[in-house]
């Protein structure tokens, strides 16, 4: 899976699944931009990966729900790396659990702004470059919640990930003629700092263990590679068997 000299953007990459994805890509020889709303954490992650793997990394602060910030972030990466071959839209947040009728429009706007519109903004910013090169990989972060509705009292999160799911398939058809693949991964119960208090248990999974960020990162590594050149429009389940289709 030679990715030497290629460059990637990974959003929400300062910790958890995003950081594991960034680590996988730098281990494969990629230059990686760590994009995160937390500047200090992004710098720390970029420096850690550079020191550990001798990688060419950079940290970019960005609130993915703000289109202007996304455009500025993409421009910074293009100025530094000269290209972006792989976009991993990983940034996301969970929704608070409460009765459906108690969710406000602000709640819906916040979750959709980060979990869905962030993907839209980064795709819009990078698609022209990828179309011109007739090459590229776009990998979005869906969730098994898009299929199951998620755990009780989390409708906004599930709906936002269902939107990512559908956009991925639609965009794959549009980008096919340009040799740009568009796929998504749909993690199940993955243990991260963000999900630590979500109530996940080993006995919820047929394989009797919770997933790790590396379980997700290794699949993303494949989708980012030349080995996946004829794979597009796919939602890849990473859930230990909790959802089978």
Annotated model-derived regions:
Residues 2, 94-97, 148, 221, ...:
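Short C-terminal tail/terminal secondary-structure segment
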Residues 103, 149-158, 170:
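Active-site loop-to-helix junction immediately N-terminal to the catalytic Tyr of the SDR YXXXK motif
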Residues 143:
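Residue(s) in the substrate-gating loop at a strand-loop-helix junction
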